Amino acid sequence: MNIEKIMQDLERKHPGEAEYLQAVEEVLESIKDVYEEHPEFEAANIIERIVEPDRILTFKVQWVDDNGKVHVNLGYRIQFNGAIGPYKGGLRFHPSVNLSILKFLGFEQIFKNSLTTLPMGGGKGGSDFNPKGKSDAEVMRFCQAFMLELWRLIGPQTDVPAGDIGVGGREIGYLYGMYKKLAREHTGVLTGKGANWGGSKMRPEATGFGAVYFAQEMLNTKGDSLKGKTVAISGFGNVAWGAVTKATELGAKVVTISGPDGYIYDADGISGDKIKYMLELRASNNDVVKPYTFEFPGAKFVEGKRPWEVKVDVAIPCATQNEMGKEDAENLLKNGVICVAEGANMPSTPEAIAAFHNAKILFAPGKAVNAGGVATSGLEMSQNSMKYGWSAEEVDAKLHVIMRDIHQQCVENGTDETGYVDYVKGANIAGFVKVAYSMLDQGVA
C-alpha cells in the first residue's frame, strides 16, 4: 500500500479538509501490514472504496426566528459506508460544522460501529446552526425545517441518526416529532429518544460510562484499577458527566472538568451534588464552567486553559477534536500520567499520540473508548425492533460486556512482540477487517 500516493490523491480531491485527511492517514498507517497480507483487498480496491463516502447530501435549512427574521443554514448527511448495516451516526449542530469535520466523524464511525459487533454502518450529519442562545421555539422550528429535508433520506433499515454536540434530548424530540408527522409512522428512525417514546435507558450517560469501563480494562492489563486514581476529564456535557459519574462510582477521584472559558480544578473531587450541578451547568445553555466555583468555592477556575497541566494518574478528554496537543501530552507525561483514554472523537493530535506511544503508557483512541454511545444506540435499535424495553441495569450490563469485548479486540490486534498494546493499531485493524470482508462478500455494488 502506497500511503503517500493515496494521501496525495485524497488531498487533490478534498483540498483543505484537514480533519478528514488526518483521520484517514491514521487508519492507513495502522492497517498497512494487514492490508498487504491480504491481496484480495487490493484486488477489490478496498482502500479507495472505503475512504470515499457512499454519498454526501447537502441541503439548505430555512427557518424563522422569534422576531420573524428568516435564517438560512446548511444541513448535511454523510452516508459513508453501509457494508455491515444501516448507516448510523449522530447529528451535530454547531457553527464549526463543515464537510471536513463530518467526513472525519463519519469515517471514524465506520470502524467504531464495526468494533461494537452490532450491525451498523457508518454515517454522520448536522448543520452549522447554533442552538445556544436560541429559544425553545426557535430550536423547534429549526429542527422541523431540518427534518423536512432529511426525512426522505433516512429510515430504520436505511440510516438511523442520533445526537451529538448541540443535539440532545430536546432536539431529538423535535426532530422525531416532525419525522413522525411526515412519514406517518412510529419507528426507530432516530436513537437518543425519550424513554417514554421508544428510547433506551442509560443512553445519555452511555458514552461516558463506556469510556470509563474501557479505561478500567486498560488498567487491568497492568494489574491495576481506577480505585484510588486521580482523573482529569475535559468537557462538561453528557460524555464528561457520564465519565465523572462512573469513574467516581469505581473509586477514582475526578479533579477537573472544562469548557470553552477554561477549566475547573477541584482538589476534593467532583462527586455527589457536584456531579448533579454539572447537569445544571449544561442546562443553563451558557457554555461556561466558571459558575461551578460560585457554587463550590473550594474549587479553582483557570481561565482560557485546558486541564492537562494538572497532575493526575488518568486523563479522559471528552470535549472535542484536537483539544490535546504535543505540549499537553508532554505536561501529562511529566506529571506521571499512566493512562489516557479518548472520550471524545480524535481529541489528541498526531503529535500528542506519538508522545504517548513513545512513552509506552496506556493510550486508546476515541473510536474504541467512546463506542459505548453508539453501542447503546444499537441496543436502542434492537429494543425498537422488538417493541420491548430493557431496564437501566440490563442496558448497563450489556454495555459493560460490549466495552470489554472491544478492549479484547484491540489487545488481540494491537499487541507487539514486546507485549506493548498499540490500541490505535488494534482498534483500526479490528474495525477495518470486518468491514473489508463484508465489502468483499457483497461485490462491487
Where are the regions that the model predicts?
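Adenosine-phosphate binding glycine-rich loop
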Residues: N2-A23, M218, L333-A445
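Glycine/serine-rich phosphate-binding loop and adjoining beta1-alpha1 elements at the start
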Residues: H94, N113-K227
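Flexible, glycine/charged-enriched surface loops at secondary-structure junctions
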Residues: L21, E37-A44, T117, I154-G163, ...
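Structured beta-strand/loop patches that form or line metal/cofactor-binding pockets in enzymes
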Residues: E40-H71
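Conserved active-site and cofactor/substrate-binding residues in soluble primary-metabolism enzymes
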Residues: M1, P15-Q22, E26, F41, ...
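Rossmann-like adenosine-cofactor binding region
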Residues: G262-F363, A368
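Glycine-rich phosphate/diphosphate-binding loop of Rossmann-like nucleotide-binding domains
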Residues: T191-G194, G199-K311
